[in-house]
């Protein structure tokens, strides 16, 4: 069985935490912890060839920066091209195995919408059947790509937009979208991610490091209890300087 099949299988009764006959999705004001659900959706299509080390290095640097701090961080890493492949499935960030070049092999097309849609469904189901005290306070989707959607077969842009709107408006989930070679703000807007959560990056060594450093800054601000703004553009300032 491929990892992607295991990752997206229906929840079994043993996974229901004592709730086999129903479940509740808790709203953002009802959190009982300071934990974070951190979901990476990373482009592994053929156009990313030549940037393997930059992608892996940027990802690993972000993981290292997010270690420590208050609350647990559960990391899921979904790589996508024509299909989806899972490197991490809700692994505690303190225990996570960093990626290597062997984990990242670009090929194929860009099924971005399917990667987002299936990941939202998976995390939503986890939260739905979890005990209230186990649902993380923060849920953050970090999405990176270097090209336009061209291969999804399950989800449309309008369906993803509806899903993201529900999760952001009702449950306080955050989605950030950082892209190269396309208009990130326009593309993000088509799927319901507002412009304050979107940015472009350059495909260079410095550009990749700025990309992951900026995304890490967004996550740091969200995890912080200092009420730091996420709408002032400061989290992506480093990208503007590249």
Predicted regions and their residues:
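Acidic, low-complexity intrinsically disordered regions
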Residues: 1-242
